[in-house]
Amino acid sequence: MKKIIFFGLVVSVLGFTPLHTVVGSSHEDCAGVGCLPQEAQNQCTKNFRDGCIDWANGVFYAVGFGVPNTKFKSAAQRNYSAQVAAEQVAMRNLLRLVETTLLDSETTVQDGMLESDRIRTKIKGQIRQVQMVGAPRYMSDGSVNVTMKMQMREVIKVLAEDPRIKAFSAPHEIQAPQALVSTSTAGSSTSTASGVFTGLLIDARGTEISPALSPKVLNEDGDVIYGFADVDRQFSLEQGMMGYLKDPQAARSNERIKDRPFEIKALHSSGKNNADLVISNADGVRLRQMNREQSFLREARVMVVLD
């Protein structure tokens, strides 16, 4: 009874609205991220105790556990109460996962939420609109596990709207290169043209890089080669600055950069949170030249391979 009352307090404080799905419920026991649907487990790049992040597609997943309210007499009512409790816990875990996500190499999303009441209110509002993934899992002891997901772009848009968030500040609108060869409109012919690339693939294995919403690529002198100010706002808000995967071949064939990505090796990570990547000065010079003539950096067509 105390647990149900506690979950009720979560509802009153955060204002969550429960979502309900019963059809096709599972009865297999599980725990933690092991309760995530198989599709989420297959796609996630980073796992945590109560959820995971799919950094390739920009999705947060969180699981929630709920127990039935024993004061209800019917099994249907007890199942319903357990599901509602599980949904609230999943939303709370999702909020915690979002808060602890790196914003850049120095700050987290929670830092941004502390900086602005507006950011905090909007992100919590987005949490209330999250979707359940798959059907609830009913355990053998009557408890329930559910999975909720949230699109990363919803968080990025909220943060980017606030001028106080330096990680998403840009001095000017990004202009298309004069000699632009558009990877998004030129079709398959661009993938075979000499010197024309469809994206950037950075091998960051061994660098201890940590994924972030607004990372940078630096050269050995500390100059920014790629950052939020170098990307068209439409692309950065919709798909983020970079995608991250552990499988090199999966990263190479990812829709974001596939066909003919320019491949480089990162030297090491940088910053307090190890979210920035350092590349050689020679690669930096070549990328800057490409950025003047091609569109893949402006369109955030960047993938990073992790350990």
Language-model segments: which ranges?
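Positively charged n-region of N-terminal signal peptides that target proteins for export
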Residues: M1-I4
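Intrinsically disordered and other compositionally biased segments
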Residues: F6-F7, T21
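Bacterial N-terminal signal peptides
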Residues: G8-G15
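Domain-level marker for long, solvent-exposed, non-transmembrane regions
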Residues: P18-D307
